[in-house]
Amino acid sequence: MLIALSVMLAVFAALMIFRQVHSSRQKAVAEIVAERLHVSDLEKYVDSEYSGRYVDAILCEELKSSMLDVYNRVCDVEKRSRILMSHNPSIAKFKYDFENLDGIVDAHNNRFKDDKLREHKAFFDTVLAYPLDDQQRRSIVSEEQNCLVVSSAGSGKTSSIVGKVEYLIQKKHIRPERILLISYTHKAAAELTERMPHPGLRGYTFHKLALDIISAQSKCKPSICDNTDAVFVRIYRELAHNADYRKCLVEYFADYSDLMELDEDEKSKNVRRLQLGESAGRQYCALFPDMDGNEVHVRSGEEKKICFLLTSLGVDFRYEEPYEHQVADECHVQYRPDFSIHYTDGGKPCRLYLEHFGVDEHGMVPTWFAKDRGLSYEEANERYNDGITWKREVHKKFGTRLIELSSADFAYEKARQRLKRELVAAGVPIREVQSDELFDRILPENSMREKVFIRLTATFATLLKTSCRSMADVAADVAQRGDKRSRFIVGKVLEPVVVRYNEILRSEGKVDFTDLIVGATALCNANGGGNYDCIIVDEFQDISMDRYNFLLALRRGNPQAQLYCVGDDWQSIYRFSGSDMNLFCHFDQYFGKTDLNKIETTYRFGNPLVEKSAAFIQRNPAQIRKNIHPFSSDAKTEIVFREYRRGDAVGAIERIVAEIPLGKSVFLLGRYTYDDYLLAKNFRQRRSGNSLFYTVCGREVEFLTMHRSKGLEADYVVLLNCNNGSFGFPSTIADDPVLGFVMSDSDGYLFGEERRLFYVAMTRAKVQ
């Protein structure tokens, strides 16, 4: 027992000695590491080393690199020696600061901005005719490599740009020729130049800048094809003489053009749903009239195809004509078969009925039938099939002839073959219309349908370039997605247009406007970029992929040029022209570390419009959050909704205009130029340049489309035709889905672009 106790005491003593030695070793190693640290307090170091300087992304990375070796050594010693150094204040402080260096730099830069704002207060108070606000000033003194200024309607973004330029020239002593100003229109670029008449400073559009770069570096000014619309009309006319292409167009309109007629809500649902079944209303317009010459509106894409097939087979029909016998009872309304086919047999008028049933080869309805009707799938399937049975029994009872097509038949050729076989068996005379005649009937020369189709081809070819994609890229995407419709339209309908368009430009030695940007980008990349210290871009929410690549090339240099980009994602309304809102909303992902500044005071309008318009647009989670407020709590801008009876739109406009005080400016805004049709029929018109005026109640008011009104303002703004419909607002005209291969991704919010356009239209008003 005594020996065992002695051993235990010896072990305990040894452990105590080991702990003391280990603790001393920990302390000694930590002290050695601490002594070798040249910097332990990075906060003080940054403020001292960069006193009076802005630490931009490049400097921040250099600072991290210079400290990284020391940080790694500390971590390595801890790991290999199993020595915890956090008890040493110097080491603990260094590690914490290094791991939070971005925050330290941001705090330093904010203090830098505060100092500059105090130092240059008099400048910001007087550089314009009115003092710049705090948010505008803060964005101007930023010296980050990438500065994004998120503006708001009427927030003075142009004032911010002018203030930035004057600050760079007067306070940073940057030569005017080293500052590049870019806007989207010639008018805006000219206005910027006029407001800042410094020798060497000039506002450009992207296209004008690209043209000048190519001309200067190649010593040859490019010939620009400035009427591409005419080129696409010419291409269509050429291709329309090709029998194979004409056949493809007939197939396109017969079998694939359905989705162009649907609004975003419908199109966002299952595409199979749109093609198969019945909609609540008649949303599809058949290509040809019925036997009486009446336009036919049907309930599904497949019924639209049946209309085409009947016409192409030379068969007379009416859609949903009442059944020839009275069959309405307590459970059923009067029966209206989908199609009533009329023909003569031996001089005797005959009628045959055709029903389209939305069931598959197993007699099962699509799953969405149940959801739309609030039923279980079994109930929906049973009810629909009960309806089929009832219709068959009606025809059996009265001895009338019924032929049937189902959704299972709708591969185009399969449906045609079956329908033709059934009609022939029933004794219906077939007078097949030739492909050329069908083409001429589908696309009469100068018809609206022809114009819309040519516009589709032009839009696709243009967006293909602005998205910096090739036909090979699109073909790969189409192959991956694997749907028959896209393969057919891209490969058979659109690619021949793109190929011919590029052939014409090459053969005539011309370029289009997108070619200018692509060509100038290549030259800048090859020759080291532009010679600029700062590039300022207005209306940045309209940026497209080709312009983005151009900016990257322009800023290349040693050092690279700073970017100061100003725009409002709430007013991004040009996706159809190639703009990509992602480049704005995710700016830092494309350009790198970014100093984001918001200017949220609107000087144009007041409440309740400020609060209501902001709440409206921010329902879309894709939009950047802002706290918009009017410059004065006394500023008031009312929103008034006026109902009018159908047919009384002119009277409603007259009553509204008559209430507006004389001397106040008035805009009439329409979603489409089509909206001025009613005005032109009822009011005297006057044109002045590109402006259009109407005399209403003895005073002149200006008509603009909502897109054209962007950037403008009036005391009173009247939004016309705010009715749901194809040409209403929001517009339910949908783009063909194939444009999705060349357009930027939608923000995914229902009517997202239409909502932004509505915001633009609302915020033109100062009073009401």
Where are these regions (language model features)?
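Basic/charged alpha-beta structural segments of nucleotide/phosphate-handling enzymes
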Residues: 58-106, 231-284, 412-500
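Conserved RecA-like helicase ATPase core segment
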Residues: 387, 392-393, 546-637
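P-loop NTPase Walker
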Residues: 19-225, 759-763
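Conserved helicase NTPase motor core
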Residues: 95-153, 202, 281-282, 289-292, ...
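Conserved helicase C-terminal RecA-like lobe
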Residues: 661-665, 709-768
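Short beta-strand-loop-alpha-helix junction that forms the active-site gateway
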Residues: 336-386, 569-570
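Conserved P-loop NTPase-based nucleic-acid remodeling module centered on helicase motor cores
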Residues: 37-45, 49, 53, 178, ...
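Helicase P-loop NTPase motor core
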Residues: 148, 154, 158-161, 282, ...
